[in-house]
Regions:
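Non-catalytic DNA-recognition/assembly elements of restriction-modification systems
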Residues: 1-44, 166, 170, 174-215, ...
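Short, contiguous acidic/charged loop-to-helix segments that flank catalytic cores in large enzymes
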Residues: 78-81, 110, 123, 186-192
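A short beta-sheet element
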Residues: 62-63, 82-143, 150-155, 160-161
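Glycine-rich beta->alpha junctions and the first turn(s) of the following alpha-helix
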Residues: 121, 132, 148, 165-171, ...
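Sequence-specific dsDNA recognition surfaces
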Residues: 27-50, 59, 63-90
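Acidic/polar loop patches that form or flank catalytic/metal-binding clefts of enzymes
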Residues: 34-39, 131-132, 145
Length: 224
């Protein structure tokens, strides 16, 4: 049983923390940290990546898309394959690191392949029970303050992957981390299900509405 009595707590910059927690750096976690530019030089990216405003092979996931919940930029199959170091499968933690620094999202699962856009970094835990703990940590007050503490640049705030990997993080013991994961996992899965249902409804609306407007679809006999 977890004991959080004061005699088992340590005073830290984050306040009182159980002495059983480990203080690590992000770079010491079993975690893949990558971004768009990990795939090559700016010249090679320009030569091999083409963005489209109409549907194509894969989604190009940007910070603005994650904020709005609408995904309207795409890449072709060649671009997607070239960007293999930043492929998204859903469930990754995405953090904006240029401009709007510190926005944190869980990558949704969409109906096409996905690849990471620019100005954001992606975290893919190799240990499943780290996923939601890390997401909440970076959304939380202290996680946010740590991220804001490493941003530089006057005209356009930003931070780099190296500084991010050097940030401290408190990690609970494995048994407590697993308990936490099992408690919050159903909540996040329900959110995912609702998001997928919303996407399906949006696709249905976008298919039917033009047919209604053009009188191609007759609903005059439908009883409400």
């Amino acid at each position: 049983e977890f004991d959080n009595s004061s005699k088992n707590m340590l005073e830290t910059r984050f306040g009182l923390v159980p002495e059983s927690f480990k203080l690590l750096k992000n770079g010491e976690l079993p975690l893949v940290v990558t971004d768009y530019v990990a795939n090559g030089s700016f010249a090679s990216l320009k030569a091999n990546v083409t963005l489209y405003q109409e549907p194509n092979y894969a989604y190009f996931i940007r910070n603005t898309d994650l904020k709005s919940g609408t995904f309207e930029v795409f890449v072709d199959e060649h671009s997607y394959n070239f960007l293999s170091k930043s492929t998204l499968y859903g469930g990754e933690i995405i953090i904006s690191n240029v401009g709007d620094v510190g926005s944190v999202f869980l990558c949704p699962k969409l109906d096409k392949p996905m690849t990471l856009g620019n100005n954001i970094i992606m975290l893919r835990p190799e240990q499943e029970n780290l996923r939601y703990y890390l997401y909440i940590w970076f959304k939380w007050l202290y996680g946010q303050s740590l991220i804001q503490g490493i941003k530089g640049g006057s005209a356009q705030p930003k931070f780099n992957k190296t500084d991010f990997k050097n940030l401290p993080i408190f990690l609970p013991p494995d048994d407590l981390l697993e308990q936490f994961h099992q408690i919050v996992k159903p909540m996040f899965e329900l959110i995912d299900e609702n998001n997928m249902e919303n996407q399906a409804l949006t696709r249905t609306r976008d298919t039917i509405l033009p047919r209604l407007m053009s009188d191609e679809l007759d609903v005059s006999d439908v009883e409400i």
